[in-house]
Amino acid sequence: MDFSAAEYADRDAKRLEEVLVGPPVTWVFVGDSITQSVVHTHGARGFVEHFAERVRGELGRLPDAVVNSGVSGARAEDLLSEFDWRAGRFAPDVVFVMFGTNDRQAGPDGVRAYRYRLDQIVQRTRDLGATVVLQTPPPILEEADHPHSGLVDYVEAVRSVAADLGVVLVDHSARWAAIAAAEGSGPAPAGWLDDPSHPGARGHLEMARTLFRTLGIDDDDSAVCSTEIEVDVTTPV
């Protein structure tokens, strides 16, 4: 049965609400090094780990499985070629997808192909019977000679696919941009990045908070949601 984008959006939003109060489920996160969350957190939790603590610990969903299938350096096309291994074999109920930071190395000419691949990821995830959630990658430090400059076009592609296919969107990029603008600190809030392309511990915590808000599980009384991480804003990335 075919649904309109609006019908998909309404259905998936309701599914996520039901999942959070229903029987045990499997949550799978796919993406690149930001999802994998290695090195740049310096031993602190990545956003997927914060999610697991919030859902399995604080919300008492102990039997839930949270799978981090992120791979450093991965692009959307890599997931498509390894979809069954990185996502399908876990029989997921919900799949969170975040790519773009590496994909943008293809430049402006690569945006159309990237958008098509996201479309295919959404369709293949839905074919599994799972609910898909798209995420925009957080901003990076834009430099003319940096291989990841020009990410904004890929962020817009994620938003476009989410709107066209009725996919729930976690817009990390918008949240980071809003805070950075309020601070006058550039493309990313001060202290949220560990290097020009990777969030540090504070950045991952803020990504988790954005995810919680999108899913409606943010709570000021939660230890995870109210955690504070001190950052050194005097040292440039």
What are these regions (language model features)?
Residues 1-72, 83-91:
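Serine-esterase "nucleophile elbow" of acetyl-processing enzymes
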